[in-house]
From Swiss-Prot:
ATP binds at Y44, K83, D488, G525. It comes from Caldanaerobacter subterraneus subsp. tengcongensis (strain DSM 15242 / JCM 11007 / NBRC 100824 / MB4) (Thermoanaerobacter tengcongensis). The gene is purL. It is found in: Cytoplasm. It comes from the Bacteria. This is Phosphoribosylformylglycinamidine synthase subunit PurL. Belongs to the FGAMS family. InterPro entries: PRibForGlyAmidine_synth_PurL, PurL_linker, PurM-like_C_dom, PurM-like_C_sf, PurM-like_N, PurM-like_N_sf. The keyword Secreted does not apply. GO terms for molecular function: ATP binding; magnesium ion binding; phosphoribosylformylglycinamidine synthase activity. Mg(2+) 2 binds at D109, D260. It catalyses: N(2)-formyl-N(1)-(5-phospho-beta-D-ribosyl)glycinamide + L-glutamine + ATP + H2O = 2-formamido-N(1)-(5-O-phospho-beta-D-ribosyl)acetamidine + L-glutamate + ADP + phosphate + H(+).
């Protein structure tokens, strides 16, 4: 076979392993099946040994990692279903379809579990939009997400977007979907019942996306442009029909098991379901509805055509299934049956064209513990001499520059393209600390966020990853939600490089430590490696998707200033940390220093305090202090509430560091004057420092530091800078 396995991404050792499993050389169809199932994208062969360190158990966990999505109990016989996935490589090549099918795929993962999807979030990373290609990627990724979500009628309620040089040419598109299901109606992908029919439902099968999973397990290069056929094409209207047909099907007792067809198409759905159930499956390819003529067994088994599901049905119920799908104008074809021998047997024209043990494709995939070493530049990049950072003269200009930086400026240009109000349950819309979606027929709501500062993770993956978890949990607490579960998307470079494996390992350890401390289980997730462009890796970017529970939706809090004369209080301690900060990057062009330190116990106390203050109705607004420090948080709350602020700070720090330090575990709250003493007392009981720093008043932002006026600007001037930046960047030539 002239080492064709290498072209399919398999190593010589892996090929030898396949021969020893089968006791013979594989044919081309079998080789294709192994190449996709043993790719990093499907097998997690470089990350699985590390992922076992993540905490996955908890009192609310109904389903942890290993199924199509994670499931958490939220009481009242309801559960929340959540998952995040990447579509980075396809989006780099064909951004519109890459992003759109990323959204389509994650939605299918949710309704496969029996849940109705209620919200989408997207976590995006791009290069600096100062060249045509980057702008093209941004425009088309956002349009792809918007069109798919808007057409299928699921609101895109939140997410996060960062712009850094390291993502140029390799953008990150991580899509998260959340659904609600009654606990006794959860569906799983565990095939059982010898002789039960296997059906493919939904769209027809074509040649799109063949080998997409293997493609997603390689570095991007000049040649990647030629791999556009590896990018699938999505049809959101077809998916809407598929969603409704599946939910109607789940109301019957016909379904034994169901799995969506994502990466590796029919191959992965068949072997994953069979191996979970300890059974085999026989598939007759002549019965698969095709949209193109002359397709080979290899092409049919590896096609990643969208909007398809594989269903194991109770014997004799085939007609019931066909009736439902016919009503919705969709295919439902019986293509095979469950067998007792543990083999995936594929038949075409009456002949066996592939026959492999199901478990050999899934559980027996190789696993690698790679060599690691600390990157040679790591110590150097952490060094920051504060004397290199001269205190600026004009602090008004600095404040304008920081809040109009790409990472802090309003992302309205992006989210205004999304319909975030469809289904009418969105309580807190994009642009706030966390999105909130109410659950119909209850007083409950779910708060959602995605977070990760890749720059911190570049400077220190262990600490940066802890901060990503802490920031996500803090964002949920700011709206009054108790964090209940994590879904993570680990975006890294090539793990075969020792420095990258070191980043991946330390990042996972950091996430594990933070999740254990906060007692938040990781219930699902995704790993995306080989994110490199012309040999340069992206910043390590472990995106944390998190859900929080609000028992009473009337008690939520938001970040906008509400009332004149309210007292502004900072919770938490400013340690004067500008390493890795937005201030350092924007005003001095530096990405260096230690990222802010994080004390997880202090963070926990802050979060518990804010939840108590919100629950008891003692505060009028709350906003976490993160990128851009106190000054950015102040301006964001002021803009959101259309009210100015007068601030007076006493500090031993330099004025610029006091304002723009990104020290963790801090929040900005506003309190009615008569409640201030009670708030300070409760903060003291929680051992959280609390400092009165000013009042909400007027239409200007005025800041005095140690008695000296440092900043005095009309809010509308700041708002203009903050609101207009991304639109301006995207429209200029």
């Amino acid at each position: 076979m002239n080492k064709i396995w290498r072209e399919l991404g398999l190593t010589d050792e892996e090929y030898e392993k396949i021969i020893s499993i089968l006791g013979r050389e594989p044919n081309i169809t079998e080789l294709g099946m192994y190449s996709v199932m043993w790719s990093e994208h499907c097998s997690y062969k470089n990350s699985k040994p590390l992922l076992k360190y993540l905490p996955t158990k908890g009192e609310r966990v109904i389903q942890g990692p290993g199924e199509n999505a994670g499931v958490l109990d939220i009481g009242d016989n309801l559960a929340v279903v959540m998952k995040i996935e990447s579509h980075n490589h396809p989006s780099a090549i064909e951004p519109y379809q890459g992003a759109a099918t990323g959204v389509g795929g994650i939605i299918r993962d949710i309704f496969t579990m029996g849940a109705r999807p209620i919200a989408l979030l997207d976590s995006l990373r791009f290069g600096i939009p100062d060249d045509k290609r980057t702008k093209y990627l941004i425009e088309n990724v956002v349009a792809g997400i918007a069109d798919y979500g808007n057409c299928i009628g699921i609101p895109t309620v939140g997410g996060d977007t960062y712009f850094e040089e390291s993502y140029k040419g390799n953008p990150l598109v991580n899509a998260m979907c959340v659904g609600i299901v009654e606990k006794d109606k959860i569906k799983k992908g565990i095939a059982k019942g010898i002789g039960n029919p296997v059906m493919v439902v939904g769209a027809t099968t074509g040649r799109d996306g063949i080998g997409g999973a293997s493609f997603a397990s390689q570095e991007l290069s000049e040649e990647s442009e030629e791999k556009r056929p590896s990018v699938q094409v999505g049809d959101p209207f077809m998916e809407k029909l598929l969603l409704e047909a599946c939910l109607e099907l789940f109301e019957t007792d016909a379904v034994v098991a169901i799995q969506d067809m994502g990466a590796a198409g029919l191959t992965s759905s068949s072997c994953e379901m069979a191996s979970r159930g300890g059974v085999g499956m026989e598939i007759d390819l002549d019965k698969v509805p095709l949209r193109e003529e002359g397709m080979t067994p290899y092409e049919i088994m590896l096609s990643e055509s969208q909007e398809r599901m594989l269903v194991v049905v109770k014997k004799g119920k085939e007609e019931d299934v066909q009736k439902i799908f016919k009503k919705w104008g969709l295919n439902a074809a019986t293509i095979g049956k469950i067998t007792d021998d543990g083999m995936i047997r594929v038949i075409k024209d009456g002949k066996i064209v592939a026959e492999v043990p199901a478990k050999s494709l899934t559980e027996d995939a190789p696993q690698y513990v790679r060599e690691e070493e600390v990157p040679k530049w790591q110590e150097e990049v952490k060094k920051l001499d504060i004397n290199e950072v001269k205190p600026p003269e004009d602090m008004n200009k600095v404040l304008k520059d920081v809040i109009s930086s790409l990472n802090i400026a309003s992302k309205e240009w992006i989210y205004s393209q999304y319909d975030y109000m469809v289904r009418t349950d969105t309580v807190i819309t994009p642009g706030m600390d966390a999105a909130v979606v109410r659950i119909k027929g209850t007083r409950k709501a779910i708060a959602l966020t995605t977070d990760c500062n890749g720059r911190y993770c570049y400077l220190d993956p262990y600490i940066g990853s802890q901060i990503a978890v802490a920031e996500a949990a803090r964002n949920l607490c700011m709206v009054g939600a108790k964090p209940i579960g994590v879904t993570d998307c680990l975006n890294f470079g090539n793990p075969e490089k020792k420095e990258i494996y070191w980043q991946l390992k330390n990042s996972i350890f950091g996430i594990a430590k933070a999740c254990e401390t906060f007692q938040i289980p990781v219930v699902s997730g995704n790993v995306s490696l080989y994110n490199e462009n012309e040999g340069e890796a992206i910043y390590p970017t472990p995106v944390i998707g998190m859900a929080g529970l609000i028992e009473d939706v009337s008690k939520i809090c938001t970040m906008d200033f509400k009332k004149e004369r309210d007292v502004i209080i900072i919770l938490g301690e400013n340690k004067g940390e500008i390493g890795g900060s937005e201030y350092l990057k924007v005003c001095f062009g530096m990405v260096k220093g230690q990222p802010p330190q994080i004390d997880l116990e202090k963070e926990k106390r802050l979060q518990e305090l804010v939840l108590k203050l919100i629950d008891e109705g003692l505060i009028n607004s709350s906003h976490d202090i993160s990128e851009g420090g106190f000054a950015a948080a102040l301006v964001e709350s002021a803009i959101a509430g259309k009210k100015g602020a007068k601030i007076s700070l006493q500090t031993s720090l330099r004025a610029d560091i006091e304002l723009f330090s990104e020290s963790q575990s801090r929040a900005l709250i506003t309190v009615s004057p008569e409640k201030v003493d009670e708030v300070l007392k409760i903060a003291y009981e929680h051992q959280v420092p609390a400092q009165k720093v000013g009042v909400v008043e007027g239409k200007d932002i005025v800041i005095d530091v140690n008695g000296k006026r440092i900043i005095d600007l009309p809010l509308e001037v700041l708002e203009e800078s903050w609101r207009g930046r991304i639109k301006w960047e995207m429209e200029r030539n």
